[in-house]
UniProtKB/Swiss-Prot annotation:
The keyword Repressor applies. Forms a heterodimer with ALPHA2. Residues 120-140 have a biased composition (Basic and acidic residues). The keyword Disulfide bond does not apply. The gene is MATA1. It comes from Kluyveromyces lactis (strain ATCC 8585 / CBS 2359 / DSM 70799 / NBRC 1267 / NRRL Y-1140 / WM37). GO terms for cellular component: nucleus. This is Mating-type protein A1. GO terms for molecular function: DNA binding; DNA-binding transcription factor activity, RNA polymerase II-specific. It is found in: Nucleus. Mating type proteins are sequence specific DNA-binding proteins that act as master switches in yeast differentiation by controlling gene expression in a cell type-specific fashion. Transcriptional corepressor that acts in conjunction with ALPHA2 to repress transcription of haploid-specific genes. Its main location: nucleus. InterPro entries: Distal-less_Homeobox_TF (IPR050460), HD (IPR001356), Homeobox_CS (IPR017970), Homeodomain-like_sf (IPR009057).
Length: 228
């Protein structure tokens, strides 16, 4: 990852923090004065399975730098105290994401041939290209039809339940930003006590419904007959 990419990542995340602050002000939070911790560096810990002699250590070091900078931005610039977010929980969550990313590539011989699929990768074009409708959480496959071999050919998925209060906040964030990137979704998930997957699915479905509504209005407008 080049320096320009890192600068773009930090710019996006910093911008999102400011949007969250503006939203908090609109909702009545008193954010006068920045009570965020003084700026200081944070570093991800290495999984115990990895050492400096690992053949992919150079790649892992770059990945660690990406996580370090993202964590620093969140902890130093995102007004965690005002938004009642626990910094310790955020650190633990990002550390787990980092460990999973490292271990995913631990046994790959030629890391240069692998596309970076780290959970902290930021928006690519396909993430905001909605090609399906009403997506459910595919990580939770229902096995209620295990006695029916025909039905088993078509697995069903459990719908993720989101509380009414959380949906209201998601709706407000959607008005600010319709396609949050991976770190932003993680930040929102921490605030609302959801999983990043639930947040991603909600925004995907919301964009699909908004797009369908806009398309429908345009079609009706074109088909409307005006008196001559």
């Amino acid at each position: 990852m080049c320096d320009n990419d890192m600068a773009d990542i930090q710019s996006k995340l910093s911008s999102f923090c400011e949007e969250i602050r503006a939203l908090a002000l609109k909702e009545g939070y008193n954010l006068e004065g920045d009570k965020s911790p003084s700026s200081k560096p944070y570093f991800m810990s290495w999984p115990k399975e990895i050492d400096v002699n690992h053949p992919n250590f150079a790649f892992f070091t770059k990945l660690q730098f990406q996580y370090d900078k993202s964590l620093e931005t969140i902890l130093n610039s995102c007004y965690l105290q005002e938004l009642q977010l626990d910094p310790t929980r955020i650190i633990e969550t990002l550390q787990q994401h980092f460990n999973n990313s490292i271990l995913r590539y631990a046994d790959i011989e030629n890391i240069s041939d692998v596309k970076d699929e780290s959970p902290m990768s930021f928006d690519t074009e396909h993430e905001c290209t909605d090609t399906s409708e009403d997506i459910s959480d595919k990580s939770e496959i229902s096995s209620t039809n295990s006695d029916n071999p025909i039905q088993n050919c078509y697995p069903t998925y459990k719908r993720s339940f989101i509380k009414h209060e959380s949906r209201g906040i998601l709706e407000k964030i959607f008005k600010v930003k319709q396609c949050p990137n991976t770190s932003e979704r993680l930040y929102i998930a921490q605030k609302l006590d959801l999983t990043p997957s639930q947040v991603r699915i909600w925004f995907t479905n919301k964009r699909m419904r908004a797009k369908k509504h806009t398309t429908g209005k345009g079609t009706k407008r074109k088909s409307k007959k005006y008196p001559s």
